[in-house]
Amino acid sequence: MKKYLITSPELYTQEPQSFEAILRRILTEHTPEYAVYRDKQNPKYKELAKIFVQVCREFAGLCCLLHSDAALACELGADGVHLTSAQLEAIPHAKHSGLFVILSTHTDEEITHAIALGADAVTFSPIFPSPNKGEPKGVEALCEVVAKNPIKVFALGGIVEPWHVEAIAKSGAYGFASIRFFVD
């Protein structure tokens, strides 16, 4: 099962040197196959995105993504972009630009649209209780989504314990995505 690391400014900081050190340590310790730089409010987003891509390049086989900004992902040489569910219509442009595309989804309808528009993978969330993310969908709903949709599905939301990962593995999901699971 694939591991997908999502950064958070609260846990990785917005200070370039600290960000780089924390990122490198976590990538070394957890060896995820996918990683996305996500910081919706940072005025230094481009500066830290550049550091993120450079550090990710040190880890062979790591698929490096930026959150929401396909143009910047292309400019900095990232492998892909993680789009929000509100950015569904941006999938074709991102794919045309040669990017690997993951879309955040919360419903079957969003997954169906993501597939139709050519997304490579989706996150489906929240699976477990997660701060400010609404009612958890649960592992049973994840199993249903995985069984009926021909796309890579990453479980997301509230994944903080090894037993969460074990439950997701049994669902047949392609992988799991998390912020807090990877932080000590």
What does each of the following model-derived ranges do?
Residues 1-21, 99-105, 154-155, 160:
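Active-site mouth loops of central-metabolism enzymes
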Residues 5-11, 84-93, 121-136, 158-184:
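Glycine-rich phosphate-binding active-site loops on the catalytic face of alpha/beta enzymes
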Residues 22-31, 53-59, 74, 93-96, ...:
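Acidic (Asp/Glu)-rich catalytic clusters
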Residues 34-36, 65, 82, 102, ...:
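Conserved beta-strand positions in the central sheet of alpha/beta enzyme cores
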Residues 34-45, 126-132:
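Glycine-rich, proline-tolerant flexible connector loops at the mouths of alpha/beta enzymes
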Residues 46-68, 85-107, 135-160:
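Alpha-helix-loop-beta-strand connector modules within alpha/beta enzyme cores
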Residues 64-79, 90, 106-118, 146-178, ...:
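Catalytic cores of alpha/beta
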Residues 100, 104-130:
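Histidine/lysine/aspartate-rich catalytic loop segments that bind and position anionic ligands
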